[in-house]
Design a protein with these regions (language model features):
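Alpha-helical scaffold segments
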Residues: 1-178
């Protein structure tokens, strides 16, 4: 813990408190993730993920790793860069004992690859859309600027709420375009 915090330049966390209290550790991990994601270099990411994943409470470590995945996905230049970055982390992620935690992180990576491919110009099919989580479908419904993607979500979204968000956003985008 001390090395992880020092490596991120965080010196105001009591290491003994962090070791003893999962809430203090979780907060410290969030800060480490922020520093790590804001760095231009990705060279230390695997070692940082490995250190976080040694936490005795997998839910705490999983949450921190997911936060890093989310931040890096929003920072990369495209799906190829994210695919390469995430592939370097998968051996560490696969060390998690709980299969549900491993699967959750793998699904999140898949979701972001899907999102980034759309941002890169790919128009997904209904079958591809069905393979991403409800969370990612909602992110797309709330953030996509593509009328074609919004129409797909309106027609094929997995939940009524997703379909309604997409339908309403597509309608308002059409009005603004007129």
């Amino acid at each position: 813990m001390a090395d992880l915090l020092a490596g991120a330049g965080i010196f105001d966390v009591d290491v003994d408190d962090a070791v003893a209290d999962e809430h203090v550790r979780s907060s410290a991990y969030r800060r480490v993730v922020l520093v790590t994601a804001s760095s231009r270099s990705r060279g230390r990411d695997r070692a940082i993920v490995a250190a976080i994943l040694r936490d005795p409470i997998e839910m705490v470590s999983k949450s921190a790793v997911v936060a890093l995945v989310d931040r890096i996905a929003m920072k990369v230049t495209g799906p190829a860069e994210f695919r390469q970055w995430s592939a370097e982390l998968l051996p560490e992620i696969d060390q998690l004992k709980a299969e549900r935690h491993r699967e959750f992180i793998h699904r999140r990576v898949h979701d972001w690859l899907f999102y980034l491919s759309i941002e890169d110009g790919h128009m997904p099919t209904p079958v591809e859309l069905a393979k991403v989580t409800d969370w990612m479908q909602r992110v797309l419904a709330e953030e996509s600027t593509s009328l074609a993607v919004l129409a797909l979500l309106d027609e094929s979204g997995s939940r009524k709420k997703i379909r309604n968000i997409a339908k309403n956003r597509a309608g308002s985008r059409k009005l603004r375009a007129q």
